[in-house]
Amino acid sequence: MSLEEEILWAEKYRPRSLDDIVNQKDIVERLKRFVKDKNMPHLLFSGPPGTGKTTAALALVHDLYGDNYRQYFLELNASDERGIDVIRNKVKEFARTVAGGNVPFKVVLLDEADNMTADAQQALRRTMELYTETTRFILACNYLSKIIEPIQSRTALFRFYPLKKEDVVARLAYIAKNEKVEYDQKALETIYDITQGDMRKAINILQASSVYGKVTVEAVYKVLGLAQPKEIREMIMLALQGNFLKAREKLRELLVNYGLSGEDIIKQIHREVTGNEINIPDDLKVLLVDYIGEVEYRIMEGADDEIQLNALLAKLAVYGEKYLKGK
């Protein structure tokens, strides 16, 4: 296998410049102004995983400094290095030296900054103030609420949102064609439905599914170790039709054959109930979603998976008798 084949597609197809980023248009336009002015404040990128926070930061520094941007740029993952020592040593050592060239500052990217301890964030705040003449900080986080207020007030906030379905599917199709991989359109849509706007995860699933020669819905679910949607729907309908014992047998089959956890199955049940493949009244959907949420909570709190899922199937049978009888 060649080195190129070993490269993760998520990295191979990561945009290198702000001009290459096709989503988050408002954010990109604001960042381009910083490049034009060769000046910017400290930045705080907030949003779900896979929405382009790190990509935008890397593209920004590339456009600021050119191909040699690495000598003006320090990237740290706060998940791995979350303590005060990192701030005192690595960041301070980098920040205290003056940048050369046309841009009068260097850039530090702290990815997953919401994983930093409160003390480390306080140390970071002081470092940001001390070296503001020579260094700009970009903090990327999934949860804005975990960033202390003194840092939030010293940064310009950029909110990244989950990518639209058409953008993700189009990007997956482009990558598949470029890699000469056959695919079904439905499979790409399924990848989006599973990843919900997380581009990095979507591309990783596409690459993993490509080993089957053609990316199909079946290949996607096989790669993820999830049950086929039609099997989940069959179990749901058996329960709604009052056939609790057969529904329970199907559940047991799914648990054994796929090695799924209760959390995996409950998420798939939720996806099918809220989708369009199962034809049930909206008022019943509301009740089911509410109860599914209760069961998921109990499972996450440590209750026995199979007992809770059996209770859910029993509830489906009761609701089916009440809402679907005679239909």
Swiss-Prot record:
Q: Name one GO cellular component term.
A: DNA replication factor C complex
Specify the domain of life of the species encoding this protein: Archaea
Q: Which InterPro entries match?
A: AAA+_ATPase, ATPase_AAA_core, DNA_pol3_clamp-load_cplx_C, DNA_Rep/Repair_Clamp_Loader, P-loop_NTPase, Rep_factor-C_ssu_arc, Rep_factorC_C, RFC_lid
Q: Which SMART domains match?
A: AAA
- What's one GO MF term for it? DNA binding
> Which UniProt keywords are listed?
ATP-binding, DNA replication, Nucleotide-binding
Chain sites annotated for binding ATP: 47-54
**GO BP field:** DNA repair; DNA-templated DNA replication
What's the stated role of this polypeptide? Part of the RFC clamp loader complex which loads the PCNA sliding clamp onto DNA.
Fetch the PANTHER family from UniProt. REPLICATION FACTOR C / DNA POLYMERASE III GAMMA-TAU SUBUNIT, REPLICATION FACTOR C SUBUNIT 4
The Swiss-Prot or TrEMBL record describes its family as follows: Belongs to the activator 1 small subunits family. RfcS subfamily.
Subunit relationships: Heteromultimer composed of small subunits (RfcS) and large subunits (RfcL).
**Record's NCBIfam families?**
PRK00440.1 (NF001679)
Name of the protein described by the UniProt record? Replication factor C small subunit
Please name the source species.
Answer: Sulfurisphaera tokodaii (strain DSM 16993 / JCM 10545 / NBRC 100140 / 7) (Sulfolobus tokodaii)
As recorded in Swiss-Prot or TrEMBL, the protein's gene is named: rfcS
